[in-house]
């Protein structure tokens, strides 16, 4: 479960065992957590699920994802290549 960003107390990370799911990122801060899908072609973010997050928390996380969208996508792609044994 590599962490790729820690901003404003939010840790953004991936899981290695999620099969062939589309690009997404998990985030956690204290007892709040969520998963967001990233639509690369449409430069869009959609909430997959959220637990114990206020509307403000969701807005903050979405803003962080948009501000680091290209970086998250790049890290996702590198992570998947390493996981699949295809190098960096």
What function would you assign to each model-found segment?
Residues 4, 15, 26, 59, ...:
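Alpha-helical interaction segments
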Residues 17-55:
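A short, structured beta-strand/loop element
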Residues 55-88:
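C-terminal structural segments of small proteins and small subunits
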Residues 1-12:
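Negatively charged, low-complexity tracts enriched in Asp/Glu with abundant Ser/Thr
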Residues 13-15, 51, 71:
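Sequence-level detector for tyrosine residue identity
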